[in-house]
Amino acid sequence: IAVAPDLEAISALSPGPFGGNMDVPDVRPGNKVYLPVWNEGALFYTGDCHARQGQGELCGVALEITSRVTVSFEIIKGGGIEWPRIESEDRLMTVGSARPMEDAARIAYTELIGWLEDEHGFSRLDAYQLLTQAGGLYVGNMVDTTYSLVASIDKQYLVRG
């Protein structure tokens, strides 16, 4: 699931800020995916759908299927996100894609800290501390040209008192 990147062309195997081949199991029905947009009309595309995939897509393939996908779109003007975000009923998640893996983790956590700051009233330091104590991190893709990692926080921790 992706939009056209701010590049002339990119391999369909490569994930990045635009989404792409992230191989993240949380990109699934019922969850919202937020993507930054660089081109008029976004030029959205989807593919490589899986019936099932473990974290990391260890052997390079998941349970690959043909699929018919129905999506709905909402334009959020001035959203200002830099990397894909995923929202489920109970978690906020951000995706970072890079090599080495540490860079992917850094991107994912930086984006999640920004989300907590911008939309949930946390200071940068408080968001960093919260993720240190209650955040999650998993590998979506570790077999393609670029690794994808997902940083997350349960929404129960977003209640400020």
Regions found by a protein language model. Name each.
Residues 77-130:
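A hydrophobic, small-residue-rich beta->alpha segment in the mid-to-C-terminal subdomain
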